[in-house]
Amino acid sequence: MEQLDVFLLGERVGVLESDRGKLTFHYLPEYLRRADAAAISYSLPLQSEPFDPVVTSVFFDNLLPPDVVRKRLGKILHLSRRNIFGFLEAIGGDCAGAIALYPPGCTKTADASAPTFRELSDEEASQILMDLPKRPLNIGKEEGFRISGAGAQDKLIACVKEERIVLPLYGAPSTHIIKPPVAAYRDSVFNEFFCMRLAQKMGLPVPECGILTLKDVPYYCVTRFDRQNKDGRISRLHQEDFCQLLSVDPEKKYESEGGPAIPQCFQLIKKMRLGAAGQIDFLRRIIFNVLIGNGDAHAKNFSVLYRGKTIRLAPVYDLLCTEIYDSLAHETAMSIGGETSFAGITRGRLSKMAQECKVRPELILSLLDEMLEKITVASNNLADELNRQHPSTVYAEICRIIERQAAWLAVE
């Protein structure tokens, strides 16, 4: 029997056990007795009994990179891609939210009062970023660097201080996600930056993001919303994506593969009591993704953020206009009133989606019209602004997609 201690917000709360690959999780009795005890997941509520292997595996699997990345990581770490326990043992020191995993008795964890960091030279940072395709997440190269992150795109999860990249070591919390250009998708860095900035202009909650340039190569850099900085001291905030909340296998994140649909996500928001503001926020995100042509808004790209007993939708992330790339499917990740083709999404489809969510169609249409009034002008103004700072033809392409979608959705 192998074991890993599970930490939440720096506190040891439970144990993950592997019996020949079969995973179970249980909370510590002394933790359950605490008045302030909190569950590590909506899908793993506080209880004394161990959780069965299925629900345990799904939650912890969702903390790891997808299979396509794990195949490359496995060659470095000598692990098979389905060895969830092995990967968590190797890279689970800093996960999404406030979860961290360590071998029992491990003493090389971050001292919260004096975490360990190593600043990189521009040359080192540039080399690490260029090497990400063959060394995902920079794993296996730096002692004490145990960081996990979901998502298929190559990324470095680290810290950025005064435009210098810093590696957090031995469990110190990371604060930024840095993404290099994706060769297959032209100007992907500027695409994501534009979509995130546009979301902000449309009133959606957006973490601080920007372009970091190293050796004349632009990188998309975003501040982690599950971290907070108080007087220079970094601490973790807990978060869960909708696959974790609904106990859905991460490889089934798309609705077409059996993953969550919009009505299912909406009902979850109701059950978690995020209130009318949370429901409207979610619907506005759905509309925005349709208008920018984002076909990758699947369940793992929506999360909730915990602050004490307060739960709200996490800021938006991983926004990209996929419609400008001919090699990608021209479909939404979650159907809109039964329609997945961007060309087939109409006001009627949005009304049907509202009915499926048990919401008045008038509400979704009013939210749509509110966004239609602003988004075309806002996107063109943003394109002009960004072209002065980071020139790219991709802005005009995204604006054309937005104009097309807006024209289709303005018609009754």
Predicted regions span which residues?
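Phosphate/dinucleotide-binding and metal-coordinating scaffold of catalytic cores
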Residues: 1-299, 303-412
